Curated annotation (Swiss-Prot):
Similarity comment: family membership: Belongs to the flavoprotein pyridine nucleotide cytochrome reductase family.
Subcellular location: Mitochondrion outer membrane
Function recorded in the entry: May mediate the reduction of outer membrane cytochrome b5.
The protein, known as: NADH-cytochrome b5 reductase 2
Top enzyme class: oxidoreductase
GO cellular component, one term: mitochondrial outer membrane
UniProt xrefs under InterPro entries: CBR-like, Cbr1-like_FAD-bd_dom, FAD-bd_FR_type, Flavoprot_Pyr_Nucl_cyt_Rdtase, FNR_nucleotide-bd, OxRdtase_FAD/NAD-bd, Riboflavin_synthase-like_b-brl
Length: 300
């Protein structure tokens, strides 16, 4: 089935064909997102407009097009200064003097000292993702932030659903990790994560580890393209249908929140796209058909 045909059918949420965090998230850099100002010492990022150069400590291939990159913070005893759910802006200057700026969400713990970790997928026409993949250990990249999209508070909701695809997993993983790392936070979490193939499932080991340790609190469902599933694949195959979501999700309620992050096709089919960086837009797609509205859904 062709990509155009897949994305033209509003009944389904499609496994990821390819989208950068930049393509789904440049809208992060907006007046809707606020730069989080933290005055405490011991944090590399405290908000504001100052770009900070961090040295690449380690670059490790995870798949043919995905790297795990570790950057050194300004001081070995520093934490990043990020909170859940927030991200950083990255910048590099082209040989012609043009700035390329994209947002990325770290996968490291907020209290991790000395380093900052990212999982970044390379795309053929992705200027920043190609630049980052070409960085050599010891070279630097400019960062600033953090930019907070949703400030999580323990037990904000009785339950949440995290629906994402591809690189859209990063802010959803932040929420999953934050909730399960706090014994006082009893929020139940359902993660529904779609990708093209099993090899494309990012940070699966981390997600599976959390799910195994919190079986009564966390449920994870993976989807991959039907033509890409291997014989030993234990997740779901094909599309994430409205019928699946109807069985999996709680009914619309003030105690239940859905967070969505992925490429444009996923937004269109699941939740509707954002009107602008400052406007979440109306809920469309499968979630609208299931009775959800703006107060129930947040689009990263």
């Amino acid at each position: 089935m062709s990509v155009s045909r897949l994305f033209s059918n509003p009944k389904f949420v499609y496994p990821l064909v390819g989208a950068t965090i930049g393509s789904i998230g440049l809208a992060y850099y907006s007046t809707q997102a606020q730069f989080y100002i933290a005055n405490e010492t011991g944090k590399t990022f405290t908000g504001g407009d100052q770009w900070i150069d961090l040295k690449l400590k380690k670059s490790e291939d995870l798949t043919h097009n995905t790297k795990h990159l570790t950057f050194e913070l300004l001081n070995p005893d520093d934490v990043s200064g990020l909170i859940t759910a927030s991200m950083l802006m990255t910048k590099y200057v082209t040989p012609k003097g043009n700035n390329v700026i994209r947002p990325y969400t770290p996968v490291s713990d907020p209290d991790q000292k000395g380093t900052l970790d990212f999982v970044i997928k390379r795309y053929e026409n992705g200027k920043m993702s190609n630049h980052i993949h070409n960085l050599k250990e010891g070279e630097t990249l400019s960062f600033k932030g953090p930019v907070v999209k949703w400030k999580w508070e323990p037990n904000q909701f009785k339950s949440i659903a995290l629906i994402g695809g591809g690189t859209g997993i990063t802010p959803l993983y932040q929420l999953l990790r934050e909730i399960t790392s706090n014994p006082e936070d009893k929020t139940k979490v359902s993660l529904i994560y779609g990708n093209t193939s099993p090899e494309d499932v990012l940070i699966k080991d981390r997600i599976d580890d959390i799910a195994a340790k919190h079986k009564d609190q966390v449920k994870v469902t993976y989807f991959v393209d039907e033509n890409k599933a291997t014989k030993d694949w234990e997740g779901e195959v094909g599309f994430i249908t409205k019928e699946f979501l109807e069985k999996e999700l709680d009914k619309p309620s003030p105690d239940f929140k859905i967070f969505v992050c992925g490429p444009p096709g996923l937004y269109k089919a699941i939740s509707g796209v954002k009107v602008s960086p400052t406007d979440q837009g109306e809920v469309e797609g499968a979630l609208k058909d299931l009775g959800f509205s703006k107060e129930h859904v947040f689009k990263f």
